[in-house]
Each structure stands twice: as C-alpha cells, then as structure tokens.
Amino acid sequence: TGPPHSMHLIAKELHKKFNIPWIADFRDPWTDIDFFSELKLTKRSLKKHHKLQYQVLTEANKVVTVGWDWAKGLENHGAKDVAVITNGYDFNIEEKLRKVELSSDFTMSHVGIVGAARNAVRFWEALGELVKEDTLENFSKSLKVRLIGQVDNSVIETIKKNDLESYVEIIPYIPHEEVIVEQSSSHVLLLFINNSPNAKGIMTGKIFEYMASGRPIFAIGPTDGDTAIILNKTKSGVIIDFEDKEGIKNVIVDLFNKYKENQLVTKNNENVENYSRRSLAKEYVNLIKKIVETRQ
C-alpha cells in the first residue's frame, strides 16, 4: 500500500525474488497527486518517478485504488483494469451513532481540516445572503454551523466577510469518540472538497463515517466526480459545484424547510452497508482468491 510509494518498490523486489502474487494498492495517486507539480524535481528525477510508476503499474498482478477517477489516471499511466475498492467506515460505530439525539438548532457540521483549498467561498456567501435577506422564518434564529477541526485563516476571513461569526462555532480539536457523536447530532453534514485540479478524484475517508451516521450530506465540489458517484449510489446527500451559489442557496433553503417540518430523519440505507470495512474486506478477499486461482 502506498503512499509512501517506496512500499511498491519493496513489494516489486519481493515479487521478483520469491515469485509471489503482488497487489499494488494506491490509497493516493503517485505522479497525479495534487502537490506533485509543486515538488522541486529535476528533469532526471521527474523521469525516474514516471519510470518507477510505470514499472509498478505494469508488473504488479493487480492494481487497486480507492476511486474511479484515480483508477482511470493509473490506467493512463500503464495499468490494466484497475480495481476500485474504496475506503470505508468501521461497522462497530453504526449503532452508537444512531442513538444520538439531534440538536434543537438547525445545525450543519463539517468534521475535519478546512484548509485554504477547502474554503467553500460560494457556500459562505450564500449562507450570508440568506441571513441578511431574512425571508426564511426563524432561519437566522435557528442557524448553527460547526467546524470541528483545524480551520485555515482564509476560511475564517471569508466567514467574517459574510458577517457569519455569530453563527459559526469553530472547535479545533475533540477526541474521535466525541467527534462521531457531534456529527450525528447535526441535521446536515457538510463536506468541502479541495478545489484543486484533481478534485474529481477526491473522496475523503470522512464521507463514509458521514454515511454511517445516516444524516444527510451536503457536499461542495465537482458534480461529476467520485464523491458525486458515492452520494448518488447511496442516496446519502447532494453535491453542488464550487461556483454554483444559487444552487447552494436552494439546497440550504430546502434543507431548512425539511428541518422545520421534521423531515431530516436518519436514514437506514442498505447500500451504505456496502462501504463498511467488513464488506470491503470481503471484496479484497475475493480479489486475492481470484489472483491465487489464476496462478494455479
């Protein structure tokens, strides 16, 4: 499993020496990762990266990654028929999550780091406009946004610019056990995708814990990316494009109206269970069995 992708090079040598099956599992891309272009590489080093990547992708018995967009990228670099086995959630948390009582306020929460690349500017603008317009009865009185995790200064400045300081609570750190309780008491779970060139392939591990809670997910990101595929497959939420401010406003209004009508209920969706680590482990077992069988 990589990164670090040096692990694949170790596996490559073991595969050669002992003639044993080799699965190269990419939790993140190699040369397509978003910060790769920022590395201070010489032409020789860049060529070496691509050469080693090609060797790994073409010599492994099977290449696996966590999303469909990344699978296409790896195939473009030489891999054949890349298998997609996504990240998932720990099935032991499901019952604990579902016993949590909802907040009385209309609470939208984001769990995890909100860096500069995750500054959903149009979301904050839409929220600020809805508060100022004051056309939704009790919206400003009920609204509460919680950001649980580190928040970049650029995000804080955007919040201030839209006069939302009194509606947003930033909680820098709480233990994981408390995090899952906090997210399950929220009416809506926010997911901000990095606004970067590889945004289509970004599918944070957090989305799976979100799905396990059964709370509706509101994501900001590419509507044709891997996160959109997962949300559509599981009917766990909605995703709106980074720049679609009107679309964002419409979703917030719809969610708030459902909150008022007590319709933001916790959903038990059997499709979500396919993304428990137990189910995903079975997928991996089947993959390993196939590889072993083809060698016999």
PLM feature segments, named:
Residues D69, I85-G88:
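Carbohydrate-associated surface elements
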